[in-house]
UniProtKB/Swiss-Prot annotation:
It comes from the Bacteria. SMART domains: DALR_2 (SM00840). The lineage of its organism: Bacteria, Pseudomonadati, Pseudomonadota, Gammaproteobacteria, Pseudomonadales. This is Cysteine--tRNA ligase. It comes from Pseudomonas entomophila (strain L48). Zn(2+) binds at residues 28, 209, 234, 238.
Length: 460
């Protein structure tokens, strides 16, 4: 039985879909003004893991993750670059998809873009105005009336009276209350705009997600997710808009993933510790990065450091060494490991405990590989099967263990030396065999002799 920590109730709850076996999940995606950073990667991988386990558990999942393709940051960056906002967003969307491909992230079922849902935003805003939850001061802007919504703060546990302390209305704003937030922004000179009943302008950030989620999944759906930094004000405002407009509960469960810390500090451009996904993947194997992101519980903060990456690489090497040299066959045996893995994942997607099961499975494979190759191979298939839930262990073992060899050693030369060494051993020329092995070792290559022959990998 699957339990999920619901940020709304601040407790773990038994997961009960609203519609039988069908599950509808919406996750806040990228604002595409720049390359994805590690924090985005954290959210991408976390909800990819959740997607994989829901489907593995037999649920019929519809996974929606939006793209915010109009925003102040996008407009500012496009102006800095001297390009149109849509040219910038198209380029960044392509880059995002490439990052996801390298991290083995499955595509969402739907990936709505804000600019494709402008009419729906007009309709929801008008509904809010008609119900008294929003107002148009006459300058092209439309604001949400926060004080009108009785449930404001129920997600973040923030109180309106506390929020009002220090809140103020900025110059140029026409709010009735400092806490009110914008639903529609009147057009400014030189900015992209769309016609609306309140004049030309563009949507506010929060209304975009309310409209895209309900358009794709209905007025009420099962799971709404995102990074913990979105809990307030973004997700709080989504609830206020959506429930005021529809009169129905918005999302049944709210899930938030933890943030990335760099060497124990918050990731920040000002601290010069800001990394894009592509920067990291150019330096480290994508599976090493993915395992780092998935091995910690999705709600926990992750510390990104050389040490943590080294630990991630070491863990994967242990897994792949267990797979190496065994025939690739269907999973067989190991039902007790599957049961433990299932218990861990059903407890709010408990990946630390699930990964511990994989290490125990590796020990059993290694115990059997010399005495019962068939049983070891079946368990190796099981290791790959469970690894697939985490999005890892699908590569050829030698391919992973040799990763990074390109540009460091000549693979053809290594293979030729291995053949020469094999011939020397066949000729019982042990001195020549040892000399060749020493030559290969000096190249930074480790040889491993086994029943299936000699394989090699780069030294750590």
């Amino acid at each position: 039985m699957l339990t999920i920590y619901n940020t709304l109730s601040k407790t773990k709850e038994t997961f009960k879909p609203l519609d039988g076996n069908n599950v509808r999940m919406y996750v806040c995606g990228m604002t595409v003004y720049d390359y994805c950073h590690l924090g985005h990667g954290r959210s991408m991988v976390a909800f990819d893991l959740i997607t994989r386990w829901l489907r593995k558990s037999g649920y019929a999942l519809t996974y929606v993750r939006n793209i915010t393709d109009i925003d102040d940051k996008i407009i500012n960056r496009a102006n800095e670059n001297g390009e149109s906002f849509d040219a910038l967003t198209a380029r960044m969307i392509d880059a995002m998809h490439e990052d996801e491909r390298r991290l083995s992230i499955l595509k969402p079922d739907l990936e709505p873009r804000a600019t494709d849902h402008i009419p729906g935003m007009h309709a929801m805003i008008q509904t809010l105005i008609d119900k008294g939850y929003a107002y148009a001061p006459g300058n092209g802007d439309v604001y949400y009336r926060v004080g009108k919504f009785a449930g404001y703060g129920k997600l973040s546990r923030k109180k309106i009276e506390d929020l009002r302390i220090g809140a103020r209305i900025e110059v140029g704003e026409s709010k009735q209350d400092p806490l009110d937030f914008v639903l529609w922004k009147g057009a400014k000179p030189g900015e992209p705009f769309w016609d609306s009943p309140w004049g030309p302008g563009r949507p506010g950030w929060h209304i975009e997600c309310s409209v895209m989620s309900t358009c794709c999944l209905g007025e009420s759906f099962d799971i709404h997710g995102g990074g913990s930094d979105l809990e307030f004000p973004h997700h709080e405002n989504e609830i206020a808009q959506s429930e005021a407009a529809t009169g129905k509960p918005y999302a049944n469960a709210w899930m938030h993933c933890g943030m990335i810390r760099i060497n124990g500090e918050k990731m920040s451009k000002s601290l010069n510790n800001f990394f894009t996904i592509r920067d990291v993947l150019d330096k480290y194997h994508p599976e090493v990065v993915r395992y780092l992101l998935v091995a910690s519980h999705y709600r926990s903060a992750i510390n990104y450091s050389e040490d943590s990456l080294r630990d991630s690489k070491g863990a994967l090497e242990r897994f792949y060494h267990a797979l190496r040299g065994l025939p690739r066959v269907a999973a067989k045996g190991g039902e007790a490991f599957v049961e433990r893995f299932t218990v861990a994942m059903n407890d709010d997607f408990g990946t630390p405990e699930a990964c511990a099961v994989l290490f125990d499975l590796v020990r059993e494979i290694n115990r059997l590989r010399e005495s019962d190759v068939e049983a070891a191979a079946g368990l190796a298939g099981r290791l790959r099967e469970l690894g697939d839930v985490l999005g890892v262990l699908q590569l050829d073992a030698d391919e992973f263990l040799r990763a990074g060899a390109e540009g460091k050693v000549d693979a053809a030369q290594v293979e030729a030396l291995i053949q020469a060494r094999l011939q020397a051993r066949a000729d019982k020329n042990w001195a020549e065999s040892d000399r060749i092995r020493d030559q290969i070792t000096a190249m930074g290559v480790v040889l491993e002799d086994g029943k299936g022959g000699t394989t090699w990998r780069l030294a750590d």
